[in-house]
């Protein structure tokens, strides 16, 4: 079997993880305690669940995942939540002291104490796999644990499991909404690590998803639960082809092969369509062409950047439900004729499509309406560099005054690491600029 391990780090990683496992359980007919819903699997392929779940001798399903945090608050929520009996107690790992929004605490001082325990649990999970395909890593880069401990874990996974794919779902700071003053520092330091130690990183940002919830689902004040359930739908769509049958299934390494033209250019935009509320669903039915167009709308993007201001290098469309290959071909052909959707001239085709017959599942009493067909798009666009430029500007404003730097140095970090990480970000911005430039000749050897 081609198993995938999920690692959820820090508050954002764990809360997104909760929403994902809630959805996977519904999709695979698994109760909150890991038992199987009777008669559910008769109509589905029986071992679909084993990519993400292992099976105990008593027939209980256990998620192949680890939840990791430096303080116990969010892990306690999982331990006392609806799915408390789903996870093995050893999969929920927490320390006693939090990272206090400080990358250096997560990476050097507090993180060092917990990393060996985490790697030991991961090793046990890996030993329980017959053919590990790779890791999914969930974290945010604004806080201390997600950025610091997240980077440390990625570095160690590269050492221990060098050849395995690492796919990151990374929450970046929002342009307007900030949860910590030092977010720009943490983000730049963590991206420096993501560049080297992930193969594909899907960039998410709370503000963009917040606006989708307000606009498309008519939720006046979206909560993290609303946001995370929407993120879970994207992650479920990306991983559906690892778990269910379809006409064109997409493997984790295929994402890499099709989306990443140069190793460093691996930060992806994602979108989902249709996102419709329960009251709208009764009056509307969306065709394959309509949902494909909707996925390319700037408003549908799960990160704050405008793809019309950049060029696409590659694009993965994962369709679910009642979708025929000929409709997909027609929709993609129509997209290619649109002037607003520009591809770089050295990559004229740029589309990878997957079709999965499992229709989208929604959480009962949730905000999303059940639909017959949906599409999730993961695209590699030069527009994503807007996210980095924004963070770099904020970093420069603070770092020019050396504001807050003593908190990092006090935790054993060298000040030179700030400069090194910032230079790497400047190089990344330049890489994106070169890739989007008109001619292939301008692309230098700096990518290799």
Curated annotation (Swiss-Prot):
Entry cofactors: Mg(2+)
The enzyme's E.C. designation: 3.6.5.-
Catalytic site: 254
GO BP terms: microtubule-based process
GO cellular component, one term: microtubule
Domain of life where this protein originates: Eukaryota
Listed CDD domains: alpha_tubulin
Residues the record lists as binding Mg(2+): 71
Gene3D superfamilies in alphabetical order: Helix hairpin bin, Tubulin/FtsZ, C-terminal domain, Tubulin/FtsZ, GTPase domain
Binding sites annotated in the UniProt record for GTP: 11, 71, 140, 144-145, 179, 206, 228
Claim: Nucleotide-binding is one of the keywords in the record: yes
UniProt keywords, alphabetically: GTP-binding, Hydrolase, Magnesium, Metal-binding, Microtubule, Nucleotide-binding
InterPro entries: Alpha_tubulin, Tub_FtsZ_C, Tubulin, Tubulin/FtsZ-like_C, Tubulin/FtsZ_2-layer-sand-dom, Tubulin/FtsZ_GTPase_sf, Tubulin_C, Tubulin_CS
EC class (word): hydrolase
Catalytic activity from the UniProt record: GTP + H2O = GDP + phosphate + H(+)
Molecular function GO labels: GTP binding; hydrolase activity; metal ion binding; structural constituent of cytoskeleton
One Pfam family this sequence matches: Tubulin
Function, as annotated: Tubulin is the major constituent of microtubules, a cylinder consisting of laterally associated linear protofilaments composed of alpha- and beta-tubulin heterodimers. Microtubules grow by the addition of GTP-tubulin dimers to the microtubule end, where a stabilizing cap forms. Below the cap, tubulin dimers are in GDP-bound state, owing to GTPase activity of alpha-tubulin.
Protein family according to the UniProt entry: Belongs to the tubulin family.
Subunit (UniProt): Dimer of alpha and beta chains. A typical microtubule is a hollow water-filled tube with an outer diameter of 25 nm and an inner diameter of 15 nM. Alpha-beta heterodimers associate head-to-tail to form protofilaments running lengthwise along the microtubule wall with the beta-tubulin subunit facing the microtubule plus end conferring a structural polarity. Microtubules usually have 13 protofilaments but different protofilament numbers can be found in some organisms and specialized cells.
Protein name: Tubulin alpha chain, nucleomorph
Originating species: Guillardia theta
Source lineage: Eukaryota, Cryptophyceae, Pyrenomonadales, Geminigeraceae, Guillardia
